[in-house]
Amino acid sequence: MTNPPRILVVAGEASGDTHAAELVAALRARRPDLTFFGMGGARLAAQGVELLFDAREVSVMGITEVLPRIPRILQILKGLAEAAAERKPDVAILVDIPDFNLRLAKKLKALGVPVAYYVSPMIWAWRRGRVRTIKRLVDRMLCILPFEEDFYREAGVSARYVGSPVVEQVPSPDTATAFRERLGLSKDAPTLALLPGSRMGEIRRLLPDMVEAAKRLSAERPGLQVVVPLAPTIDREEITSRFEGSGVTPILVEGRAPEVVGASDAAVVASGTAVLEAGLMQRPLVVVYRVSLITYWVGRLMLKVAFVSLINLLAGRRVVPELLQGEMTPERIAEEVRRVWIPGAPREEMLQGLAEMRGRLGETGAATRAAESVLELLPPGRV
């Protein structure tokens, strides 16, 4: 009797874990006999994927931040390659984390394993030369942004635009009051959402200034609810400890970041996938980010686009403010939040821009279309 097709899945971010889990579910809906193993987080585990390594071990960003972790990251890379050599997967699905996954793709190519890459590296923004590596190592690039497919096809990469998985991960639009009721929050209190990221490095670098900004805004708005969605990669104490002595008591919600934004009057969001999720909730937001100086200057030299947030990149203009590096101060954060807190031209202009951005992301069904494309890579006789 022939063994069922086996698929290697590798995700390294909280968002990637979510996207990968939805793709696994879509694959299982079509082929219940498929088996999966690899690296990921809680959501892939909940889908029954056999996890050989925890995604949190490779979830780091920046040159100085990654250096201490290199030995362990290389060990995991070797472990996944050895597992692939032993188990002989019929296809591999690599999600995000390009510095890790492209190295793994090279090893998989040597083993003859077809590679589908889900959530493209942002090579159109920086390090464009990597498209040659992708052409050599990736059998199918599954694009989630509308302009990526043409970019890759012009470079000779087999690519398919499947749509943004974020579109179906966020709840349907509703009033802030309705979302507050769902989350058990006070319906009438002014509400500020803080989304500091899903990596520990982001919590350390970003949350203290977010807390200080929230303290200033709390002094101006009695009864302000400060709500923080807790990523599965972060321990609760890492959040609460950074509020100690601030006079602000955060309300922590397990996951449910889009709903937290939906419940807010405004949100402060770490640059990344969460910005797109927050924008789809049609609430005013301020994008913030800070990395080490070395990482920042290297990034400045290599960056080919004017913005860092996907909202502004998709719009081709500044829809939401981006406070980066030295501009990310409690004073500036509070100032930008005040500007869009109450009805008026700045708030309405931002909301209009967010609505336009939503229209460019297409319809739901990204995981379904991605699953169809992955199944096309199964070897003859395994389909």
Curated annotation (Swiss-Prot):
GO biological process: lipid A biosynthetic process
GO cellular component term of the entry, any: membrane
Pathway: Bacterial outer membrane biogenesis; LPS lipid A biosynthesis
Catalytic activity: a lipid X + a UDP-2-N,3-O-bis[(3R)-3-hydroxyacyl]-alpha-D-glucosamine = a lipid A disaccharide + UDP + H(+)
EC number: 2.4.1.182
Keyword Lipid biosynthesis among UniProt keywords: yes
Pfam family, one: LpxB
Stated role: Condensation of UDP-2,3-diacylglucosamine and 2,3-diacylglucosamine-1-phosphate to form lipid A disaccharide, a precursor of lipid A, a phosphorylated glycolipid that anchors the lipopolysaccharide to the outer membrane of the cell.
Family: Belongs to the LpxB family.
Name of this protein: Lipid-A-disaccharide synthase
Gene name for this UniProt entry: lpxB
